[in-house]
Regions:
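Conserved SAM-binding loop
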Residues: 1-52, 68-80, 144-152
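Acceptor-substrate binding/catalytic loop of class I
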Residues: 57-72
């Protein structure tokens, strides 16, 4: 296989793949020297992931999300595929907050409030976007970006 690809972008993709290790190894083998892979994926280490982990976290997207990552296991997976992590970032994820609240409210005495927890509720989306932007500067969020470079 020629090593002639400079960049692969996996934007909310890797969690849908049954064998992400095989995918990353295949992509690493196609990268040109100095080539990069950018991965954005849910992060199970975010606050909402931990608060709603037992059942309601919006990032689960069962059955579509086959594999979920925290920062550590994503980094390990990338490094085992022959790449070096050069950058990580925490991204805002208001959608996961809204989905989590909607799921939790739907199955509780607060069910009437579930109808407020939608993406059409612009103030709620703005609130959680701002919350995650601040959190992302201080700690983790439930959405992450990792940039890796082919190790030479």
């Amino acid at each position: 296989m020629p090593r002639d690809v400079d960049l692969f972008v996996l934007n909310q993709v890797i969690e849908h793949v049954p064998h992400p290790d095989r995918l990353l190894t295949m992509l690493a083998n196609a990268l040109s020297p100095g080539g990069h892979i950018v991965i954005e994926t849910p992060n199970t280490g975010g606050l909402d992931a931990r608060l709603f982990a037992r059942r309601y976290w919006g990032g689960y997207h069962i059955p579509r999300h086959m594999v979920l990552f925290n920062e550590r296991n994503l980094r390990t997976l990338v490094e085992r595929s022959g790449m070096r992590v050069v950058e990580t970032a925490h991204l805002a994820s208001p959608a996961f907050w809204i989905q989590s609240l909607h799921h939790a409210a739907s199955e509780s005495r607060m069910a009437p409030l579930a109808s407020l927890c939608t993406f059409r509720n612009v103030p709620l989306v703005a609130l959680f976007a701002a919350f995650d932007i601040v959190r992302g500067r201080l700690t983790t969020t439930s959405n992450q970006r990792l940039v890796a470079r082919l190790a030479t």
